[in-house]
């Protein structure tokens, strides 16, 4: 089991698929969401959780004020877990809960026909997914992003930097043991220095424990 860390559904336990997924650790999720909260990137946002697994990243966003969350997961058993978790989060939040959808499709197939207007996207594929597939996903995602949208890519620390398409620019990299987070944005980095500073201040160092 894992849990929602904070927000309207804080402390709610989430189911995880029995196999075939690699849930983001609580430590890494806390680091991600501390940084996102510091730059006010969640409240009122439209969120994509690609390779959703249990849906923990998207559902954490819903708990913290996102208005729409799409969980994309091709494996039906994992998608069924996403639905159960989404129902539990919706009940816990109650009135004003985000609109949460679960899409049972390969990520690329979803992105090819998805609507634009995304504020925040999580890409957390299996570590053994090849780099060409990650690059394809990013290229399909780019035209769907709003101005100053954020993209968080979780990969193995042994994986190379993703190939960023036109329209998405690397902001920073953070390492947490065997996990690397790549933060990227559609904004001009020179114009977004205060936000980048907030991210650096809020995010724990790679060797710093998260409370």
Which residue ranges define each predicted feature?
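Class I S-adenosyl-L-methionine-dependent methyltransferase catalytic core
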Residues: 1-211
């Amino acid at each position: 089991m894992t849990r929602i860390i904070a927000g309207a559904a804080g402390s709610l336990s989430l189911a995880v698929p029995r196999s075939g997924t690699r849930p983001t650790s609580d430590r890494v999720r806390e680091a991600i969401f501390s940084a996102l909260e510091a730059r006010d990137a969640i409240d009122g946002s439209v969120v994509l959780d690609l390779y959703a697994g249990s849906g923990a990243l998207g559902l954490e966003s819903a708990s913290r004020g996102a208005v729409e969350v799409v969980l994309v997961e091709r494996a039906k058993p994992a998608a069924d877990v996403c639905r159960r978790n989404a129902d539990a989060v919706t009940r816990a939040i109650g009135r004003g809960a985000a609109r949460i959808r679960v899409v049972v499709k390969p990520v690329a197939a979803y992105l090819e026909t998805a609507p634009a207007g995304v504020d925040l996207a999580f890409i957390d594929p299996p570590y053994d997914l090849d780099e060409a597939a990650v690059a394809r996903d990013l290229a399909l995602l780019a035209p769907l992003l709003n101005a100053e949208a954020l993209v968080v890519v979780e990969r193995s620390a042994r994986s190379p930097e993703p190939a960023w398409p036109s329209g998405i620019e690397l902001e920073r990299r953070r390492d947490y043991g065997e996990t690397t987070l790549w933060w990227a944005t559609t904004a001009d980095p020179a114009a977004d220095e205060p936000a980048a500073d907030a991210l650096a201040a809020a995010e724990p160092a790679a060797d710093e424990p998260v409370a």
